């Protein structure tokens, strides 16, 4: 968590890019990654936005970028069902509850002296750019709403 907080700070972006750009990590020039870390977006055709609020998130305001939301895990599992990687009868909630240890994250945050961090399990209903809605309490409805799925 401390590393995530460090990575989130703008004054550390250059050093972070130098570290992760090394051969043993990404093996890329710093210039290839520093802009994205800082929120610079190259839209092409000379249109570049610098310092946007679209910088990569590692921590967020109160840890929400790293918090293990069970609702997001439910979406990932649902997508795996969608594409045939998991069986259609997979018990999503049971699998999430067996594998997601948000309690350990919360305990770690407390040990680190962090306050105001997330404590619930869900970000709520998510609406995507295509208008589709994922309700973690009803993943089957999301699956039924999708026209594009695994082709048998």
Regions found by a protein language model. Name each.
Residues 1-101:
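Secondary-structure end/capping motifs
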